[in-house]
């Protein structure tokens, strides 16, 4: 814990500390996405043990990543939702679906001539969320251990679902804004607005 006066306190763990490999977060990766299985709610807690010759863990020392704004879909073609702006972020989705339904959400920066998701430019980055419903009815998913670079999101499921609410949480580096710009030229203003979305890189630049 770092305090405002520059001092700090270390709160260490002891033999009473326990951990678990269970829980709904089954997989998470910076480039490939996250798997959340809400059926996995039971946690088996086990005593921890110290591993030899491991690297020292330190807290992140750069600018924090924070929510900048939320985008709603501006269009939908097939099962592809268009958020109108290429950005770094993660979806928050509420669905009405049966228990055990597997929902797959792929993210991309482009669509093809038929309006379907185009992901060849992402190379090996999968940018995919796999969400498994833990009960019947309304449930919300909000991945917290990955982020995507995208404008379009393709949603599919192995059972019929209803998307109740869908929005994209735009993520950005927590940099202090020191000025603003506006003008009557639409193209120039759009260029300026796009700059605000460049504080976190998108998949091709990662």
Where are these regions (language model features)?
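Extracellular/oxidizing-compartment recognition motifs
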Residues: 1-206
